[in-house]
Amino acid sequence: MANSPQAKKRARQNERRAEVNKARRSRIRTFLRKVEEAIASGDSSAAADALRSAQPELMRGVTKGILHKNTASRKMSRLSKRVKALSA
């Protein structure tokens, strides 16, 4: 248990940070799920739109420290490859 005032404050801040990060991670997953659903339905225009809206969310996750840069790039690359194959 945190004993010093500084440690107590850090514990409070960590709890708040964890809540914010949890919400951001959930938001990113929601956008990715929308792309997956559009791909599964076979609608190439909806999939492309969903991918366009998911990209800034992924990159925002990188800048906020939720995702590693390479992880976000890998996810974008794999999704865009699938969307491109859908329209071809």
Curated annotation (Swiss-Prot):
A Pfam entry, by short name: Ribosomal_S20p
GO molecular function annotations of the record: small ribosomal subunit rRNA binding; structural constituent of ribosome
Keyword field contains Lipid metabolism: no
GO biological process: translation
Keywords: Ribonucleoprotein, Ribosomal protein, RNA-binding, rRNA-binding
Region ranges (Disordered): 1-25
Cellular component, GO annotation: small ribosomal subunit
Basic and acidic residues bias: start-end ranges: 12-22
InterPro entries from the UniProt entry: Ribosomal_bS20 (IPR002583), Ribosomal_bS20_sf (IPR036510)
Chain ranges passing through the membrane: none
PANTHER family hit by this protein: 30S RIBOSOMAL PROTEIN S20 (PTHR33398), SMALL RIBOSOMAL SUBUNIT PROTEIN BS20C (PTHR33398:SF1)
Purpose of the protein: Binds directly to 16S ribosomal RNA.
Family indicated by similarity: Belongs to the bacterial ribosomal protein bS20 family.
Descriptive protein name: Small ribosomal subunit protein bS20
Source species of the chain: Dinoroseobacter shibae (strain DSM 16493 / NCIMB 14021 / DFL 12)
Primary gene name: rpsT
